[in-house]
Amino acid sequence: MLKLVDNTTTRDYISHHLSHLQLNLNNFTLVNHPDIKSFWILNIDSIFFTLLLGIIFLLIFFYTAKTATSGIPSKLQTIVELLVSFIDKNVNDILFCKNKLIAPLALTIFIWIFLMNLMDLLAVDMLPYIAMYILHIPALRVVPSADINITLSLALGVFILIIYYNLKIKGITGFIKELTMQPFNHLIFIPLNFILESVSLLSKPISLALRLFGNIYAGELVFILIAGLLPWWSQWIISVPWALFHIIVITLQAFIFMVLTVVYIAMAYEQHK
């Protein structure tokens, strides 16, 4: 544990593990004071691991596609085919229309978020220890989905797709009419309708982002508290059962994000009918 190596307090240990490696875009220097808040500060550790996991996902699926065989499949090909079939079935159950983009999008969202969540199961001190004492990096957080900036970015992408499909299917006039003439179909209620529908529309990406962030951040915090508060010989008693339970949580959160994305897009088709 870093706490034992540095002889720091439990508070310092927890604070260190919740600190990001940040870059100040004003002068392109690393931020030495994590308490500084600015729009021009990037959590470069979250961005790095998000991109890295995305590349790993693409490489695995590209390799599987290149080596796929119609004969006896490899274990990797079997897993990928099961995942593709599972996602495709769920998308078809939700979206009752032909769209070649939605299933690949759902697969990408599920696998990418699952890989980000999976980083939460790594040993709490492993990568931060390597970063500090070998690479001389002052801080490092390795779970991208425990960063609200990442989950909001993902949700923003979903929100753009929701707007795009609403405009594509209903047209600008139809979309504006939906925002202003529902739920009360009278001209006098246009301001009220617009407020209600706008809140409903904006709540979709916000709820997606906060749900994913809250669950994964809480799981990360529990692991840090176990490592920071308990003696080393007793940590396994709690951390192993929590890790087993957390496997369900990280999978479920990736699945929920994926399903709700498809549901929100499907609503554009259903409401048009």
Swiss-Prot record:
GO terms for molecular function: proton-transporting ATP synthase activity, rotational mechanism. GO terms for cellular component: plasma membrane; proton-transporting ATP synthase complex. SUPFAM superfamilies: F1F0 ATP synthase subunit A. Keywords: ATP synthesis, Cell membrane, CF(0), Hydrogen ion transport, Ion transport, Membrane, Transmembrane, Transmembrane helix, Transport. It is found in: Cell membrane. GO terms for biological process: proton motive force-driven plasma membrane ATP synthesis. It holds the Pfam family ATP-synt_A. It comes from the Bacteria. Gene3D superfamilies: ATP synthase, F0 complex, subunit A (1.20.120.220). Its main location: membrane. It is a multi-pass membrane protein. Key component of the proton channel; it plays a direct role in the translocation of protons across the membrane. F-type ATPases have 2 components, CF(1) - the catalytic core - and CF(0) - the membrane proton channel. CF(1) has five subunits: alpha(3), beta(3), gamma(1), delta(1), epsilon(1). CF(0) has three main subunits: a(1), b(2) and c(9-12). The alpha and beta chains form an alternating ring which encloses part of the gamma chain. CF(1) is attached to CF(0) by a central stalk formed by the gamma and epsilon chains, while a peripheral stalk is formed by the delta and b chains. Belongs to the ATPase A chain family. This is ATP synthase subunit a. The gene is atpB.
